[in-house]
Amino acid sequence: EKGWGVFGVELFVLTDGSVLFNEVSPRPHDTGMVTMASQRLSEFALHARAILGLPITQEHVALSIPDGAVAASHAIVIQGDGEAEFRNVANALSQPGTDLRIFAKPEVHGHRRMAVALAIGTDEADARAKAENVAESLEIDIA
């Protein structure tokens, strides 16, 4: 069948170099949220344009970060049972070039990805370090 829009493909690269397939989802995947920091239109906006039959040009997929800059994301996975409360957000986002997307998931039971930290850096290591710093600076309570 023919499909329109974004298909998220999740693969795992093991330490021995082998690749394992995990899933294909006919929608944007949260691991692609880095596009909200790096591109003019995110994967979510591009998905909407595709399924609505709207044109997608080079202008739509253009990067929105300075030449040579790199974007990175860091998933925030919470373990527990109850509602998650995010605190210390302003401090976590005090470094320029950082952002945080908290998902509208009402509660966590076990392990659940609840947010993603986004960052722009001068290189991959810088962007990753900034995103990790945002995640580590958050205070998360489970009630």
Predicted segments, located by residue:
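Peripheral (often C-terminal) accessory segments that flank ATP-dependent C-N-forming ligase machineries
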Residues: 49-143
